[in-house]
Amino acid sequence: MVQCTLIWAGIGAMMAVSGALLGWVVFPRAVHEKVIEATELRQGTDQYKRWEALPQPLDFKVYIFNVTNPYEVMQGRRPKVVEVGPYVYFQYRQKDNVRFSRDRSKVHFSQQQMYVFDAESSYPLTENDELTVLNMHMNSILQIIDNQAKETITNFRSDVNNTLEKIPVVRVIKRIIERTTPIQSILQLAEDETYDSLRLINVELNRIFGRPDTMFLRTTPKQFLFDGVPFCVNVIGIAKAICKEIEKRNTKTIRTMPDGSLRFSFFSHKNMTDDGMFTINTGIKDPSRTQMIELWNGRTTLDVWNNRSSGLSSSCNKIHGTDGSGYPPFRTGVERMTIFSTDICRTVDIKLTGSSSYEGIPALRYEIDNNFLHEIGPEYGNDCYCVNKIPKSIVKSNGCLYKGALDLSNCFDAPVVLTLPHMLGVAEEYTALIDGMDPEPERHQIFVDVEPYTGTPLNGGKRVQFNMFLRRIDAIKLTDRLQPTLFPVIWIDEGIALNEDMVKLIDDSLMKVLSLLDVVQWVLIGVGLLLAVLMPTVYFVKRCRGEGSRTVSPAVTATTSAASLSTVAGVTGDRSK
């Protein structure tokens, strides 16, 4: 009995130790190796197939600010806008031109994007809803000409002269004027005087933009976002020369049509196109760099933001991080991560704010860091973002924008300003000038929930708003009464929420395995400790009871014998009597 009890106690102790070793040493190592194997980018693996073509489309939601008082704004009144949306699109992503390095540690690729309208999720809204929005292309072109008038006029003067020289009658008249009159031509005057140059543009506005009576545009989401708003249609003379200069700028939101006209659209340049050549780390040599960008278009830096006075590239131009579609594994304890976004030509830091869950899967919540759209300037150590490309607008004395706004002029080749949706966290210098902004951190903040073992994004949203300054422009009569305003145009929510199939995949391949390993660990430890403690306890209890029985038995026997003798003596005495 003693030997059997001790054997069971020993087995229990061994089980407890085994459970501890398995749970805290063996299982973690095995899980670590399996996670690395599952997250590396190797051709032919399931992970590679999911990376090459996202197993589900992203949600691309667009909210458009409809202007309810356009004619009042033209008279200098405060603008009133109403958010209309979401207009929901499926965003499909497919890797093309995939090529691995010799050692397989890096992979080069481009990524095609395609947008398809999701009528069901957008209902009751449709792509053909009529809305009044800021005429972005006209406003942009006028501001660019205002800021660079002499340069612009000089460029298209030669185009106009060449055009006029091809017309025989004009050529003859021009020669006569040059011989008989010392007066300068209109084009020469335009070249010398900025104000007169703008007056020249003012005359041609109707031909270029189709007789606008406000700085706003009546359009549809389909036209404004993808199909394009036409302008520069059937233009001649100076208007044609101006349109040629617009075309030469190669602004990505403006494209040339077969008939020579131009079209502006917000996202047509993103549809059925790629956003450059990426080189990322496969994680084979260093799992901590899985999917980290090594090069974009063959470079490690941009030429968008200001560089250091020494000429060296600034931190603002540095390309690093992932593209946001995936992160390296083992995120537990990682306080910050970085995303590089080609849409806004910069990297963005996100910081750990706590834990969360998605469809029962534990996750880490990361949100945008305060320095993303915080104060900009030399005193904050980030003056490389102060490109000072939007003069005559509402800016600080050093030319930088106020808190919460970022000048994307160099990125868009147009005076576009980035904020968070509804100007969340934006300085009062901007928010006080417009009605209709209703910022809500939970709805308008950038965030992502990441599964900590694999680095898989479970749920998240990249939320940004695009704005433009609307202001008076000298010599452009249409803008005479405008008050300077940072005007909201659209905001987008580009996000991911894993579908049922992907949730099941993670649950089956990871969560259930981890749960099973936990059960095995704690069953071994629990049963082992129970046996190790219970068996000796049972043994000692039984032993104590056994000793107690042996001690009590002689006393009982003696008492019984004495009682018997007394009884016998009593009986004998009675008989004597």
From Swiss-Prot:
Compartmental location: Cell membrane
One Gene Ontology cellular component: plasma membrane
Domain of life: Eukaryota
Nucleotide-binding keyword on record: no
Residues exposed to the Extracellular side: 28-519
UniProt KW keywords: Cell membrane, Disulfide bond, Glycoprotein, Membrane, Olfaction, Receptor, Sensory transduction, Transmembrane, Transmembrane helix
Residues carrying sugar: 66, 161, 271, 307
GO molecular function: scavenger receptor activity
Membrane topology: Multi-pass membrane protein
Cytoplasmic side: 1-6, 541-577
GO terms classed as biological process: sensory perception of smell
Annotated S-S bridges: 316-384, 345-411, 386-400
Transmembrane segments: 7-27, 520-540
InterPro entries listed in its UniProt record: CD36_fam
Family: Belongs to the CD36 family.
Function according to Swiss-Prot or TrEMBL: Plays an olfactory role that is not restricted to pheromone sensitivity.
UniProt-recorded name of the protein: Sensory neuron membrane protein 2
Upper lineage: Eukaryota, Metazoa, Ecdysozoa, Arthropoda, Hexapoda
Gene name for this UniProt entry: SCRB16
